[in-house]
Curated annotation (Swiss-Prot):
It is a multi-pass membrane protein. It comes from the Bacteria. This is Uncharacterized membrane protein BUsg_132. The keyword Protease does not apply.
Amino acid sequence: MESWLTSLITQSLTFSILIVGIVSFLESLALVGLLLPGIVFMATLGTFIGNGKLPFYPSWIAGIIGCLLGDWCSYFIGLYFKNWLYSLKFLKKNCHLLDKTKSLLHKHSMITILVGRFIGPTRPLIPMVSGMLKLPLKKFILPSLLGCILWPPIYFFPGIITGITINIPPNPKNDYFKWLLLIIAILIWFGIWLTSKWWKIKKIKNKNNIHFIKRNIGWIALIILSSGIIGLILIQFHPTMIIVRKVFSTIL
């Protein structure tokens, strides 16, 4: 996938920015976004930003535009094609996810739209369900806009760091630093993933074995995430971080 994106991105700057917008649009589009690995695509684009093949700010703007178009198309698809959507096999099989999304939108519409932007399965669903529920536009516009402003750089960030570290001049100290950075990134992402799993299990009541799993996953998630955060703080004192900061400042 990366080689395919590389060949497209090297064609021209305008074409490269267009790709960022298209990827952001498809990631946000109703149902289509469920089929795409958002973190993989956006992190790959972030790698190109990190190694200087893509400019950061034009990519960010393209990401915002693509994201907003995807959100608005999804909203109006839900608004005008509600009955057809209910007849889809996918939504029938995943009616629990649809019902849960509806419940969250009824209780906390603005927070759900904003937070849902950063969660893979709900990103392309929440705008569509908002339309299906005929959520007032004034409640949809602000969280959608804020989410679309924040989402691209956050999802670019792992790739940007990867792109920067790849281009660090090779020497034994730098190779050691790269492995440290990779381990820290894995710990943080795995800790976040485990925390999300723990949060879901936490809501399940009764059953003693569930209580045992819930308690243990919570502790494991806390230990792993804390280790990653501590590692991230400590690595700031590594000499190679000076190079990383300089390269990062040139990108921004």
